[in-house]
Structures are given as C-alpha cells and as structure tokens.
A protein has these predicted regions:
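Active-site-adjacent elements of ketosynthase-type condensing enzymes
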Residues: 44-52, 107-111, 190-216, 258-278, ...
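Condensing-enzyme catalytic core mediating Claisen C-C bond formation in acyl metabolism
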Residues: 4-8, 31-35, 211-287, 295-296, ...
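Conserved beta-ketoacyl condensing-enzyme motif
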Residues: 7, 31-159, 188-197, 293-307
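A glycine- and small-aliphatic-rich helix-loop capping segment at beta-alpha/alpha-beta transitions
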Residues: 21-28, 110-124, 174-177, 197-210, ...
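Active-site-proximal alpha-helical scaffold in enzymes
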Residues: 77-87, 137-140, 145-150, 154-189, ...
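ACP-dependent fatty acid/polyketide chain-elongation machinery
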Residues: 1-66, 241-253, 348-362, 406-410
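Conserved small-residue
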Residues: 9, 27, 81, 100, ...
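Glycine-/small-residue-rich "gating" segment that lines the acyl/pantetheine channel
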Residues: 122-128, 169, 173, 189-245, ...
C-alpha cells in the first residue's frame, strides 16, 4: 500500500523574503524583488537587473567560521534547511530513515569564477584546496546531510530549471514507496555572477530591460526574456502517520508527481507543448484525480517568448477544452528565475497558497499575449479556497516536471 506524504516544514531565502512569513507578506502585497545588480560591476553588460537576496543576516543562522568554505548557493541551502527543520519541530527522529535531496542548476559558479581569477593572476599553486568541494553541485546536499546527521539517503538532482521540482518529486516517491520517513527536499542557486549573466545574455535568454517593473513579465505581449534570481527553498516531506504521531503541523499533502522529456533540443521546448503537457498528465494520473480537480497552476512562466507560448499549449494539451477553468500565475514576476531552485520556491509558494486560500498574481502584466490565452491571475492576487494545485518546472535539455499538492484539512 502506498503511503501518504505531507509537508511539515518550510524554509526559504528569496528575493522577496528571507523566511516564509516575509515571503508570503510580499506575495500578498505584490512586491517585486527585481532591482539593479549589485553583486558585480555591470558597466560592460547589457543586462542590468536581477533579483538578488537582500538583507540576509548569515550569522543569525551560522557563525562566520562555519560558512567560510561554503559557496553562496550552499549557504542559502543551509539556512533554508535550518529554517525548515526548526519549523517542522522534528527532534527525536531516525537518522537512518531521513534523506536529503537538494537540487541546483549550476552550483558553485561564484567559486569557479573566483578560483579561475586566482589561477590566472597568481598561478596554479595558489588555487584553494577547497575549490573543488566548494564548487560541486552535490555539496549542498552533502553539507545539509552533515548538519542534520541524515544518514538514510543523500542525492542531488541536476535537471536545469526543472531540478528542484524533480528533487521534491523524488523525495515524495522515496517516502511513498517506503524507503524513507523524512526527506529534506528543495533547491538552491546563486548564479548572479558576471560569467553566468554573460552566458545567458549571449543566448538572448535574459531581458535587457532597465525598468524593474517591466523586465520579468510572464505572458505579457512585450516579454523579452527572464530575469536572473537567486536563493533557496526547502520543504520537509514526512510520511503522514509519522507526522500525525508527533502532532506535527501540516501545511499540505503531496499527492502527485510527473515528468517527461522533450528529446527535442538542448534549449528550446517542443513547439506544441506536448512534452510539458505529458508531465502534467503524468502527475494528474499519479495523484488519482482528473484535470478538472486542479484549481491553480503555478506556471514555469519564465517571461521568454518561447517558454510562455509553449507552456500555454502544454496546459491546453493537459487540460483540454476546460483549460480556462484553472487559474494560472507565474510568481517569477516577483522572484525572478531562480534556475535550479525555482521549483522549490514555487512549490513553497503554492503550499502557502493552498493553506491561506489565496492565489498569487502575475505582477506587472499589462497586456496578455493572445498566444498565452490562459485564465491568468493578473496583477492582484485572488482569495479563493481550492483543493488541488499544480506547480510546473521546465528545464534546458527538455526536462519537464510537475507536482500536485492538496490542501490539508484537519
């Protein structure tokens, strides 16, 4: 018999809030976290805007020495995990039945860039012995596992911008199928560096707008690229009976997970949206419900011309003639695109949307593109009680992932 899986803890470091309360207040008040880049000199870059982490007190969570040999993306992951675990109030638990699955799209690119500079300026003997372990994508999961003494399972998912949704989905399966009782799942990213921004800009993937309110505009007729974000979100997934036995606070239930691969192009989605549509259908089937049961979709919605059109077709593929019945929004309009961490932040937002009976808006949306003719929640959130919600993530390489969450009612 398949076991049920619930969310019992939430932690987040994001451009619109450095804990779940601050983030949710920003969502309700329509705050956008996009501003001028301060992490590096943009004078030679066409891209001037990003969604950076602001006012994060790292030493509130760990002393300076503890974080000395952590890349920025690992610091974010450790802080989000600490928040989530404290929120879950897990104290006496079986470490051998506890796992960690954390995603990242790029990992320690800040460390890579810094050490490349040292190599070029001072020679190979001056490259830090900590360079490799600081840069590895899996080191966030490994470090968090050490922090928690979680010995049951530890893994990283690297599927570009679908990674964190895959991580949550894989954690869900590990618990549902009886391998683990607790999984710390999510993602972390810190790629607002000169090199990463230059690379994405060369692909013409980033918006070059200098107006922070018109840069990340998913589904808008004038959208022209995404805005880079950074941060981390972590969900504590727990087997239902395990959670009930200890009177845990339950935010929502994870009921379905689906994925697929376009097998089409290294960066472009299938033009008809069928790949992402199949991931949604797989999640719906896995949840044992029908498409009409879903009240809200937190879309991948990157604000690129290709993605938003393709995802619109994908939603139509999965929901058929009733596609207008489901509410859709992209919270990347507020957070920017956190790449491999985006699915975790958006799953956390979707969880709180279910709990608080409030649908987040797509901000700064002036004119909906006729090719994105969905039932989009525009500019102002909507108070609505829904039972099921879906969160989508799509990544370079043709990776498509969807999870379905169910409102928890005592």
């Amino acid at each position: 018999m398949k076991r049920r899986v619930v969310i019992s803890g939430l932690g987040v470091v994001s451009p619109i809030g450095n804990d779940k309360e601050e983030l949710w207040n920003s969502i309700e008040n329509g705050k956008c976290g996009i501003d001028e880049i301060t992490l590096f000199d943009t004078s030679e870059h066409k891209v001037k805007l990003a969604a950076e982490i602001k006012d994060l007190d790292f030493e509130k969570y760990y002393n300076k020495r503890d974080l000395k040999f952590n890349d920025r993306f690992v610091k974010f992951a450790r802080i989000a995990t600490k928040q989530a675990f404290e929120d879950s109030n897990l104290q006496d638990f079986d470490r051998d039945r506890t796992g960690v699955i954390l995603a990242s799209g790029i990992g320690g690119i800040e460390t890579i860039s810094n050490c490349e500079n040292v190599l070029n300026e001072k020679g190979p003997s001056r490259v830090s012995p900590y360079f490799i372990p600081m840069a590895l994508i899996n080191i966030a999961a490994g470090t968090v596992a050490i922090d928690l003494d979680a010995r049951g399972y530890c893994s990283s998912v690297v599927t570009a911008c679908a990674a964190a949704t895959n991580a949550i989905g894989e954690g869900f399966l590990k618990i549902r199928d009886g391998y683990l009782d607790i999984v710390v799942a999510g993602g972390s990213e810190a790629s607002i560096t000169s090199l990463a921004v230059a690379g994405f800009a060369s692909m013409r993937a980033l918006s070059e707008s200098t107006d922070k309110n018109r840069a990340s505009i998913p589904f808008d007729k004038e959208r022209n690229g995404f805005v880079m974000g950074e941060g981390s979100a972590v969900l504590v997934l727990e087997e239902l009976e395990h959670a009930l036995k200890r009177n845990a606070k339950i935010y929502a239930e994870v009921v379905g997970y689906g994925n697929s691969c376009d097998a089409n192009h290294i960066t472009a989605p299938l033009s008809d949206g069928s790949g992402a549509g199949k991931a949604m259908l797989n999640a719906i089937s896995d949840a044992g419900i029908e498409a009409k049961d879903i009240g809200y979709i937190n879309a991948h919605g990157t604000s690129t011309p290709l993605n938003d059109k393709s995802e619109t077709l994908a939603i139509k593929y999965a929901f058929g003639e009733n596609f207008k019945d489901v509410l859709v929004s992209s919270t990347k309009s507020a957070t920017g695109h956190l790449l491999g961490a985006s699915g975790a932040v958006e799953a956390l937002i979707t969880t709180l949307a279910l709990k608080n009976s409030y649908i987040p808006a797509t901000l700064n949306l002036n004119e909906i593109d006729e090719e994105c003719d969905l039932n989009i929640v525009k500019n102002k959130g909507l108070e609505k009680n829904i039972k099921y919600a879906m969160s989508n993530s799509l990544g370079f390489g043709g990776h498509n992932a969807s999870i379905i969450l169910k409102k928890w009612e005592d």
